[in-house]
Amino acid sequence: MEKVLFFGDPGIDDSFAIMFGLLHPEIEIVGIVTGYGNVEHIHAAHNAAYILQLANRQDIPVISGATKPLTEEITTYYPEIHGPEGLGPIHVPESVLSIPIYNFGSIASILVKYGKDLTIVDVGRSTSLAIAFNLWNDLMLNVKGIYFMGGVFLEVGNVTPLAEANVYGDPIASKIVFQQANNLFIYPLNVTNKAVLTPNMFDYIQANSKNPFHTIMKPMYDYYFSAYQKLNPSIEGPLLHDVVAISGLVNPSFFEFVNRTVNVDTYGDTKGQTFADFRPSSISEGACIALEIDEEKFIQDFIKTML
């Protein structure tokens, strides 16, 4: 059983990643750290709390993370992709607002409690993770591994021609994580752009699912797919970017990896660009970067888990 401290900014695809983690028999989520990103930090916290409420897992703490990037730039949110509060057309019920949100220092107790048995999955801006490295460096270096969704290598970005949204949102934080993390696994757009959930696949899940999220999945999916169609009318379905990283934790055989030292541009026209040396003579060291995915096996496992 993989014990996971989840960092994210839910967000529709973050929410599907949390659902996947709660339902997967090999994953135990022990805490969720929410911050700004797809939506404002307070909506992200309430969305995570709502998902936990639906799952009857209020024993899992929701921890308040970063409210703005280390770059101190004005944050751009994405209501056209994720909805005004982050769950598409869904508004969390009033009962969620009374669920306690824990302070950032609660991360330290989780790091101490689980130590080398803890894996961190980060699928949002890396601000909270970078702050955790600055506050509790020894404890952070002691975790089993860090699984990060973000970046892109040798392909185009999704928020600029060069940059992926999570890294672009706080490249200084991403740089801190890339430089300090031990046993870092990166799942960039190279693989997440292939994690397409078509309407037929989703309809099968919806028709056969008995999971506690059944009532909210369809409006979330429909909103998300509609947003993607406006950006790319030929797309076959929305992309499960964030699910890829947490799936990779328990399904490493679905991916092909290379090891490279990763860097990121932090300002200027190339802000948020991730890069590494992929020349034939380059040294195989540093982060483990997923560059290929068996999308059929990934989707089959996602469907099986969500039923």
Task: Give the positions of each predicted feature.
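Conformational coupling and interaction surfaces
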Residues: 1, 20-21, 26-29, 168, ...
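Short, mixed-charge, low-aromatic patches
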Residues: 1-9, 62-68, 86-89, 128-134, ...
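Active-site histidine-anchored catalytic micro-motif
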Residues: 2-50, 91-194, 199
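Generic alpha-helical hydrophobic packing signal
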Residues: 5, 29, 56-60, 216
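Histidine-centered active-site/metal-ligand motif
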Residues: 14, 82-84, 128, 241
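Metal-dependent C-N hydrolase catalytic cores
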Residues: 45-49, 53-113, 286-292, 307
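A residue-level signal for conserved active-site and pocket-lining positions in enzyme catalytic cores
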Residues: 62, 177, 246
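Short, surface-exposed amphipathic charged segments that create phosphate/polyanion-binding patches used
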Residues: 76-83, 160-164, 202-203, 279-281
